A protein has these predicted regions:
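Gly/Ser/Thr-rich active-site loops/lids in small-molecule metabolic enzymes
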Residues: 209-211, 218-221, 298-303
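Accessory, non-catalytic peripheral segments of nucleic-acid enzymes
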Residues: 232-303
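N-terminal active-site segment of His-dependent metallophosphoesterases
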Residues: 1-67, 145-146
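Conserved residues at the C-terminal ends of beta-strands
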Residues: 47, 186, 281-283
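Domain-start "cap" segments at the beginnings of catalytic or binding domains
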Residues: 1-23, 222-245
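A short, well-ordered alpha-helical element
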Residues: 30-40, 141-142, 258-272
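Structural beta-sheet core signal
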Residues: 5, 46, 80, 155, ...
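His/Asp/Glu-rich metal-coordinating catalytic cores
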Residues: 43, 54-69, 73-213, 221-222, ...
Length: 303
């Protein structure tokens, strides 16, 4: 039994207000679907934040419709929860994922907290804020009890856990029951795999670089999704890396070496087929307007 664990695509995100960056998030999602079809998993688990917002742009909605239709044609069902970005924080409302039930998506919700596929228990909860953590813990406890009737079980959540995000979390690691074989988590954008209870706990991470603080983890572990094999006593978790649409560069330079370093960066960028994202920090005593103008003059004419 093999499945894909993917999360945090943030489709519709127009980073820096650039349509090129919005396209990058769409393109990498397309590549993810291609790779999933190649892997031929038994099902897909999506751990939230498929979209950047609860009211995604039409293009994002159509892209997901086309992608999930392809997975349905390949007999690959999808089990999904909404995350904090694509959850509508009002009663009696529906997340955008509900549009795709006719395309093979099974929405894990308060109404349908778990499903069973080929003897595997798949249970979870949509994102719940820390202000309602008591309700979240009660749901998790309920799912833990129900899962004990099955040989294999998966818990799907879109929450931060204190062990992995100590300054901003909704759950403590001790709040999780230890009876699941795989904990398919979303919300934290860095890739994480850990031993927990009788199985493995994993954040599959985002599929694109949403913030600069993800760059270090990306360079070390890549971005993409996990391919999980449940057949052994302990799940085997393999990362499938996706190619990014453009390079992300983070540079810190001294103002005293400004001209030399900008020239070096310009030559490096000119060799690229696609314009990168450049995060640049200039250190020293300088006039900000001068540096800004110099950067525009030096780098804006690269083609």
């Amino acid at each position: 039994m093999r499945f894909v664990h993917i999360s945090d695509n943030h489709l519709g995100f127009r980073q820096f207000g650039l349509f090129e960056r919005e396209n990058d998030f769409y393109d990498v999602f397309d590549r993810a679907v291609e790779e999933i079809i190649k892997e031929r998993p038994d099902f897909v688990i999506h751990s939230g934040d498929l979209f950047e917002a609860s009211r995604p742009p039409t293009r994002a909605l159509l892209l997901v419709q086309r992608s999930f239709s392809r997975l349905k044609d390949e007999n690959i069902p999808i089990y999904a929860i909404p995350g904090n970005h694509d959850t509508i924080m009002r009663k009696n409302t529906y997340p955008p994922q509900i549009l795709y039930e006719m395309f093979g998506l099974k929405l894990i919700s308060k109404k349908n907290p778990f499903y069973v596929q080929d003897g595997v228990f798949i249970g979870g909860s949509p994102y719940i804020s820390k202000y309602y953590s008591k309700s979240l813990k009660e749901r998790i406890k309920f799912l833990g009890e129900r899962s004990k009737d099955y040989d294999k079980s998966i818990l799907v959540l879109h929450q931060a856990i204190d062990k992995y995000l100590p300054h901003e979390f909704e759950l403590k690691i001790g709040d999780l029951p230890k009876c699941f074989d795989y904990y398919a988590l979303g919300h934290i954008h860095n890739r994480i795999i850990d031993d927990f209870g009788r199985g493995r706990l994993a954040y599959s991470g985002s599929t694109e670089i949403w913030k600069i603080d993800e760059l270090k983890n990306y360079k070390k572990k890549g971005k993409g999704f996990y391919l999980v094999d449940l057949d052994g006593d302990i799940p085997d978790v393999q990362g499938v890396n996706l190619e990014m649409s453009r390079e992300v560069i983070e540079e810190k330079i001294e103002f005293s070496e400004f001209e030399e370093d900008i020239g070096r960066l310009k030559r490096y960028i000119e060799e690229m087929e696609t314009m990168p994202i450049l995060y640049l920090t200039v250190k020293g005593d300088f006039d900000r307007s001068f540096v800004h103008k110099k950067l525009i003059d030096s780098l804006s004419n690269i083609s």
